[in-house]
Amino acid sequence: NTTLAREQVWGDDRHCERCGTPVIKKDLDQWFFCTTKYADELLDYSALDWPERVRTLQVNWIGRSEGASVVFSTEQGEEIEIFTTRPDTLWGATFMVLAPEHPLVERITSAAQRQEVEAYKQQAARQSDIQREAADKEKTGVFTGGYAFNPVNGKRIPVWIADYVMVTYGTGAIMAVPAHDERDFVFA
């Protein structure tokens, strides 16, 4: 197992610049710092004499968001936590989407959907985050066979995986509200 930086991955077929081997994403032990949890402290520049341009870069990098964490329960008794800047749209959530790498995917995928989910996860692992997040990329995904319950109205809603949801962003899970979000509308 080797870790490569983005600039070491070349071509549309995503191969290693050194040996030409196809590059795939793998789950490896690594460290992440959740800067958003410390956003208020990190954004306190009162003691720093930084140029405004640098302060703006820091604000954008830290990514402070106002909103609410909401927990959806699954039929299997698991909990899917999402973060939303629009808690008022909870009533309109009609499905959920997990990142293909989300740890709950294994536990909520039905036996009937397992093969299709595994194939999709492998396909997503061959794409870079930049490719997955591209605005012009077709939104694709597969149904896990699992369901969650909307916490405000109790409705049973399907849980999908899709490569436009990133495990490294937020909780790696979203509630989908097609009436209020263009990506959710396109995916639906």
Please report, for each region that a protein language model flagged, where it lies by residue.
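Conserved, charged catalytic cores of large soluble enzymes
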Residues: 1-137
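Catalytic alpha/beta core of large soluble enzyme barrels
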Residues: 102-187
